[in-house]
């Protein structure tokens, strides 16, 4: 198989010592290569923090623990700040989108649709601004660029403690993607997700979810995602299994669209809550059994299987994603930001805080703003952001790490109090072991030529790429010519 030989050859090439001579750009390259490509990307996400108010005081929340600059307060985003934020996003989005050729506009709108993601605090404590922002963004002249209201996509992340008929009707009629925080059954959830009086919130949240499912079951199957935090003080498997069983996740009768699991974020920890031991022998044996199971299915059965088994689909997609990380064609085909261990800060994900400051994304601690809605993104601040980040990477242990270009390191996750902190020695070892395991699984897959081709065919027959499953920054240069 020609592709297999190319990829394996590239893996060997990537691990030569000469590859490590420059893993990040120098100061001139930041100016000439990174910043000059800033306008080549179209925003995939626009998030506004509508309020700092929250109905809960979650024990693992950075707000509750008053770390860095994030904290609970009674502050809400005002109408003027909201409109300035939307206007800025409209300008950035349309300036990029107008360069897209007519033949690719449908695909770009599917991957990076215009819209808003509402964030808090608890966003529904400022429901009025949510409604106003939706109405305002839709009032702008998008039609001049061939963009219609049907192209818009909205989402909201909520603890779902606030529910009334108006909110539910807004979600359902607007086809709003709803991400509900639920950490498991009552025992697991109520250990951390509590009200100010320390009373658990599970009974209210689960009751509200039941109301929504009863009111609009089809909406829930298409637009509702349950997301859980794998907190350090709970038994994660019990919580996960409880959610999967309650909502029929990964079955044909699933009551919601999907389930997502995240580790608890802890200051100065890159991999909090993640396993420290990897039983590689068992993992590879189980994966070999899975490959044999997949190989026994015809392509059409694989397509149906992946529609249900989203966890397995995600693992296979991650292995196929190694193609681009290995970059077996040529280095120029790579996204320059991906090659240099980051995303296009300030444009791929435009995050606006309640005060109108623009930050890299909602994963950060708000300690390094990139601009504000009145003046826009400051290229000087972005340059300083990259300079400080790359200085840490260049002068730290990353420089000699064989896994650096496969690492899932993220500047937002490493940012604390305005400074970048690298993972500790043990965390890096876990990362390397995971990457090594992924590469071994990938080579196992490559050695099964027939299955590899069947999986490629199955992927092509799955629903087209959308903002939900497209993981790369969107470079519009790829879509300028038909």
What role is predicted for each listed range?
Residues 5-11, 15, 357-358, 363-482:
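Flexible mid-to-C-terminal extensions adjoining Fe-S/redox cofactors in radical SAM and related proteins
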Residues 121-123, 159-161, 183, 229-231, ...:
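Active-site beta-loop-alpha junctions enriched in small/polar residues
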Residues 50-57, 346, 398-400, 404-405:
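Cysteine-centered iron-sulfur cluster-binding motifs in ferredoxin-type domains/subunits
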Residues 352-353:
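Short, acidic, Ser/Thr-enriched surface-loop or helix-capping motifs
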Residues 25-158, 162-166, 174:
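Conserved alpha-helical substructure of the radical SAM core
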Residues 172-178:
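Glycine-enriched alpha-helix->loop->beta-strand junction motifs that scaffold or abut catalytic
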Residues 46, 116, 154-156, 178-180, ...:
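Hydrophobic faces of well-ordered beta-strands that scaffold small-molecule active sites
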Residues 101, 187-206, 210-342:
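Radical SAM enzyme [4Fe-4S]-AdoMet core and its adjacent flexible, acidic
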């Amino acid at each position: 198989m020609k592709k297999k030989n190319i990829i394996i050859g590239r893996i060997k090439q990537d691990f030569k010592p000469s590859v490590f001579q420059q893993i990040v750009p120098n100061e001139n390259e930041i100016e000439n290569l990174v910043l000059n490509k800033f306008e080549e990307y179209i925003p995939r996400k626009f998030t506004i923090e509508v309020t700092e108010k929250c109905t809960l005081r979650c024990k693992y929340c950075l707000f509750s623990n008053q770390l860095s600059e994030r904290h609970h307060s009674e502050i809400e985003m005002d109408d003027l700040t909201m409109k300035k934020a939307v206007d800025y996003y409209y300008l950035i989005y349309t300036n990029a989108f107008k360069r897209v050729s007519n033949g690719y506009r449908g695909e770009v709108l599917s991957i990076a649709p215009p819209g808003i993601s509402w964030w808090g605090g608890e966003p529904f404590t400022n429901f009025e601004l949510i409604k106003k922002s939706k109405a305002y963004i839709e009032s702008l002249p998008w039609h001049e660029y061939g963009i219609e209201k049907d192209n818009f996509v909205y989402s909201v992340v909520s603890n779902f403690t606030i529910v009334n008929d108006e909110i539910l009707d807004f979600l359902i009629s607007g086809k709003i993607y709803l991400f509900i925080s639920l950490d498991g059954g009552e025992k697991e959830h109520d250990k951390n997700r509590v009200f100010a009086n320390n009373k658990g919130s599970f009974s209210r949240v689960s009751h509200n979810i039941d109301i929504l499912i009863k009111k609009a079951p089809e909406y829930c199957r298409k637009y509702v995602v349950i997301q859980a935090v794998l907190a350090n003080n709970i038994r994660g498997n019990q919580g996960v299994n409880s959610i999967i069983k309650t909502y029929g996740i990964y079955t044909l009768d699933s009551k919601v669209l999907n389930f997502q699991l995240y580790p608890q974020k802890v200051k100065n920890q890159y991999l909090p809550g993640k396993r420290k031991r990897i039983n590689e022998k068992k993992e590879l044996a189980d994966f070999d059994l899975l490959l044999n199971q997949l190989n026994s299915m015809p392509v059409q059965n694989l397509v149906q299987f992946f529609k249900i088994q989203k966890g397995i689909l995600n693992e296979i997609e991650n292995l196929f994603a190694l193609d681009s990380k290995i970059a077996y064609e040529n280095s120029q085909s790579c996204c320059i930001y991906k090659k240099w261990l980051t995303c296009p800060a300030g444009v791929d994900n435009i995050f606006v805080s309640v005060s109108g400051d623009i930050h890299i994304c909602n994963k950060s601690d708000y300690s390094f703003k990139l601009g504000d809605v009145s003046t826009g993104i400051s290229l000087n601040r972005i340059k300083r952001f990259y300079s400080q980040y790359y200085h840490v990477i260049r002068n730290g242990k990353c420089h000699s790490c064989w896994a650096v270009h496969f690492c899932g390191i993220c500047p937002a996750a490493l940012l604390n109090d305005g400074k970048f902190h690298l993972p500790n020695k043990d965390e890096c070892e876990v990362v390397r072991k995971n990457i090594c395991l992924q590469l071994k699984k990938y080579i196992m897959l490559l050695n099964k030529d027939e299955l590899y081709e069947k999986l490629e065919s199955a992927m092509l027959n799955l629903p087209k790429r959308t903002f939900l499953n497209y993981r790369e920054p969107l470079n519009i240069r790829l879509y300028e010519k038909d």
